[in-house]
A protein has these predicted regions:
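Hydrophobic, Leu/Ile/Phe/Ala-enriched alpha-helical segments that form helix-helix packing faces
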Residues: 1, 22, 119-123, 169-173, ...
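Short gly/pro/ser/thr-enriched loop/turn and capping motifs at secondary-structure boundaries
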Residues: 5-8, 66-68, 222-224
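Conserved beta-strand termini and adjacent loop/short-helix elements that scaffold enzyme active sites
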Residues: 2-3, 146, 217
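Autoinhibitory N-terminal propeptides
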Residues: 1-25, 35
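Subtilisin-like serine protease catalytic core
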Residues: 25-160, 177-178, 209-211
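Histidine (H) residue identity feature
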Residues: 11, 23, 47, 111-114, ...
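Noncatalytic linker/hinge segments flanking ATPase motor cores
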Residues: 16-21, 39-43, 75-88, 184-188, ...
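Substrate-binding/access-modulating region of protease and related hydrolase catalytic domains
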Residues: 150-235
Length: 236
């Protein structure tokens, strides 16, 4: 059989997902004036895609895993909150050690970073030149990031931690007087499967009562044997 040539389909990702027409005339939607909330594993905040003209595009980064009593408040019961000024100071630090001292938040898995890039990356690379081919959906938006804390020995957070993260994003959206789109790129096969669990009803309430959109991942457990299967036979 003759060898075949393959291409990177990711190049046409924006077009296939119908984003390209939204970015161009007559809509020209870029995310400017809108908040994007990424609730995930954190973010590599020093990536050029999240920096514009030397200033971080991240308004707030709540790292639930970094302990700092000075950050505690009614909406920050644990973890540490970093604002845009602190993050910008970190990305402009003289070296990586100083950067981590100023803002020690790390995206260990990289999942949150790539999700944020798809949603809001501005296309900037290491040369700081914008590449429109690789920019995200809302590439001129402002980011609010929550790095979720895991519970006990588990690898993923609990519903309570997720609800606190959503509440934080909404409160900051109100403070900044900007609409927000919140992304939750994870899920579970546990629960009611009827939309009546605590987290599900909470997200419904938020989406119906505030100027926001909430996107939740689904379908990733299709091959995970989380449902009944096997063969059935008629009874004797």
């Amino acid at each position: 059989e003759k060898p075949k040539q393959f291409n990177y389909d990711v190049y046409e990702g924006s077009q296939a997902s119908c984003i390209t027409p939204v970015h161009t005339n007559p809509y020209n939607l870029t995310g400017k004036g809108v908040l994007i909330g990424i609730i995930d594993s954190g973010i590599y905040y020093a990536h050029p895609a999240f920096i514009q003209d030397g200033v971080s595009r991240i308004a707030y980064l709540w790292d639930q895993t970094v302990s700092d009593d000075s950050s505690r408040s009614d909406i920050i019961p644990f973890g540490t909150l970093y604002d845009r000024d602190t993050i910008t100071k970190a990305i402009n630090a003289e070296n990586s050690l100083e950067m981590q001292r100023i803002c020690p938040s790390i995206d260990i898995s990289g999942h949150g970073t790539h999700v944020a890039g798809i949603a809001a990356g501005n296309g900037n690379g290491n040369d700081n030149e914008q590449n429109t081919k690789y920019r995200g959906v809302a590439y001129e938006s402002t980011l609010i990031i929550v790095k979720l804390k895991t519970s006990g020995g588990a690898s993923f957070p609990t519903t309570t931690q997720i609800m606190l993260a959503v509440d934080f994003c909404i409160r900051k959206s109100i403070d900044m007087n900007m609409p927000i789109a919140i992304n939750l790129s994870f899920g579970t096969s546990n629960g009611s499967h009827s939309g009546t669990s605590l987290l599900e009803t909470y997200l419904d309430y938020i989406a119906e009562n505030y100027r926001c959109a909430v996107s939740v991942g689904s379908g990733n457990d299709g091959a995970g044997f989380g449902h009944a299967n096997g063969k059935s036979y008629p009874a004797d």
